[in-house]
Swiss-Prot record:
Function of the molecule: This protein is one of the early assembly proteins of the 50S ribosomal subunit, although it is not seen to bind rRNA by itself. It is important during the early stages of 50S assembly.
Protein name: Large ribosomal subunit protein uL13
Keywords: Ribonucleoprotein, Ribosomal protein
Example GO molecular function: structural constituent of ribosome
UniProt-listed NCBIfam families: rplM_bact
Lineage summary: Bacteria, Pseudomonadati, Pseudomonadota, Gammaproteobacteria, Pasteurellales
Entry keyword Ribosomal protein: yes
Family from the record: Belongs to the universal ribosomal protein uL13 family.
GO terms under biological process: negative regulation of translation; translation
């Protein structure tokens, strides 16, 4: 018996919409990363992008447990000397709520060209409106 290897041109990708309201950030991100990689499919192949497209709505309503709302810090560098910046989870949600989910999911995907291709299939929106109705996404309950 031969091992099945998925070919990029034969992979069937579905569109799903996920409502992040009240969902715990880490648990949501782990499941999104799993589905973006395609590990939920029987035809999963590690070196082929077999994952689905995922649209996340209501990113501003994602939850964290404990004191992480004030204690969790996000860091970035501007590129200038002494340009290290930081923001708490609460500040990030106020400034750019999509980034919170994007950063969490991106850290759970492979690093390299394949991981970047998987990450491009994730669409995150702060509110309940999205512009992917033409793809007829199915509701995914996580």
């Amino acid at each position: 018996m031969k091992t099945f290897v998925a070919k990029p041109e034969t992979v069937k990708r579905d569109w799903y919409v996920v409502d992040a309201t009240g969902k715990t950030l880490g648990r949501l991100a782990a499941e999104l990363a799993r589905r973006l990689r395609g590990k939920h499919k029987a035809e999963y192949t590690p070196h082929v992008d077999t994952g689905d497209y995922i649209v996340v709505i209501n990113a501003e309503k994602v939850a964290v447990t404990g004191n992480k709302e004030t204690d969790k810090l996000y860091y970035w560098h501007t590129g200038y000397v002494g340009g290290i910046k930081q923001a708490t989870f609460k500040e990030m949600i106020a400034r750019r709520p999509e980034a919170v989910i994007e950063i969490a999911v991106k850290g759970m995907l492979p690093k390299g060209p394949l991981g970047r291709a998987m990450f491009r299939k994730l669409k995150v929106y702060a509110g309940s409106e999205h512009n992917h109705a033409a793809q007829q996404p199915q509701v995914l309950d996580i």
